[in-house]
Regions:
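Conserved AdoMet/S-adenosylmethionine-binding subsite of the radical SAM
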Residues: 136-150, 159-304
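Conserved, mostly hydrophobic/aromatic
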Residues: 48, 114, 272
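Short clusters of hydrophobic/aromatic residues that line enzyme substrate/ligand-binding pockets
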Residues: 61, 65, 83, 196, ...
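C-terminal accessory regions of radical SAM enzymes
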Residues: 295-326
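Canonical Radical SAM [4Fe-4S] cluster-binding loop centered on the CxxxCxxC motif
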Residues: 96-133, 184
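Flexible, acidic/Gly-rich N-terminal and inter-domain linker regions that tether
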Residues: 1-96
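Eukaryotic intrinsically disordered, low-complexity regions
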Residues: 152-154
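Short, charged beta->alpha transition segments
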Residues: 89-92, 102-105, 136-142
């Protein structure tokens, strides 16, 4: 059977009580946060908890991970499935929205749970792990669809799988003649860098190109431990791409965004996408108007080289996929 957690996660903060004991929320806030926890998962790894300034309620790391009762308020425009994955799911765990590529979601567990996640109604510590039969059905779908050139592993976070299981999945996909490349979307290198072991790196390396899309939203996430994890991936010849979400109070000014993108470059990450926030339930506090995002991107053009500028994108309605914000 697949094993989602290859290493000890016991020190991860997973409840309002854990957060209060760590000094990240007030004790009297716990009852209100219990209602949030009943709906949306919480997890803050030791690596991320250590970065949070407990004396600053607007700390950009804390904002990303500490739950807030505002999450229980759903705005009229917010959707449970804002990217419309469900209509494009031919078999469990697969999302096929573009002609030449498709997603594979082998599990729904993450090292941390972002408060703005567009899959927040689905992800959680139970893992949502595909059974062996479901995984074989997904493989059969990929084998039967020769137009697919790239498989994108997401979730959840694929690097939460054991090295053995991850290697098995990647190897099976890489063995399909029509698949030219693989991509893994992950927060693990910054959120839980100790997981990037030599065994995991060896499992990720395949006979076909494997791109690692690293999700990070603030320069402070690039700790020395994160830098070491990213170096282990880059030194193995794995191309690193950067993905971020434009978030109010986290990275929505030019200085913060410039620092983030420069941190990516220092760690051999090519900035790839800057996402406008998907309208998942209870995420309105993070929303940045697209006009403000465009102004931010314009301001960065005079401050950074072209290869440091990500493409600013948004999701189109009804599962139409990403498009540049214009």
């Amino acid at each position: 059977m697949p094993q989602p957690l290859a290493q000890d996660q016991s020190r991860t903060l997973r409840s309002p009580q854990d957060l209060a004991r760590a000094g990240l929320v007030a004790v009297d806030a716990v009852p209100g946060l219990e209602a949030v926890a009943a709906r949306y998962a919480t997890a803050i790894t030791p690596a991320m908890a250590a970065l949070i300034n407990k004396d600053d309620p607007a700390d950009p790391i804390g904002l990303q991970y500490i739950p807030d009762v505002a999450e229980l308020i759903t705005a009229p425009h917010e959707l449970e499935d804002p990217t419309a994955d469900a209509p494009f799911t031919p078999v469990k765990g697969v999302v096929h929205r573009y002609p030449d590529r498709a997603l594979l979601k082998p599990l729904l567990a993450c090292p941390v749970y972002c408060r703005f996640c567009f899959r927040r109604e689905k992800v959680g510590p139970d893992g949502g792990l595909l059974t062996e039969a479901e995984l074989q059905e997904a493989f059969a779908w990929f084998e039967a669809n020769a137009a697919i050139r790239e498989v994108i592993l997401t979730g959840g976070d694929p690097l939460m799988l054991s090295a053995r299981r991850l290697g098995e999945i990647l190897g099976r996909l890489a063995g399909m003649a029509h698949i030219e490349s693989l991509r893994i979307h992950t927060r693990v290198p910054v959120a839980d860098p100790a997981r990037i072991t030599a065994a995991l790196v060896a499992a990720v390396r395949q006979a076909k190109p494997v791109f690692i899309a690293v999700h990070a939203n603030h320069a402070r996430e690039f700790t020395p431990d994160a830098a070491g994890a990213l170096a282990r991936l880059a030194d193995a010849g794995l191309p690193l791409l950067g993905q971020s979400v434009l978030l109010r109070g986290v990275n929505d000014d030019a200085s913060a965004m410039e620092a983030l993108l420069r941190a990516m470059l220092r760690n051999r990450i090519k900035p790839y996408y800057l996402h406008s926030l998907d309208a998942a339930p209870g995420t309105a506090r993070f929303q940045v108007p697209e006009a403000d995002g465009l102004a931010l991107v314009a301001a960065l053009r005079g401050r950074l080289p072209g290869h440091a500028l990500p493409l600013f994108v948004c999701e189109t309605p009804m599962g139409g996929g990403k498009k540049p914000v214009a």
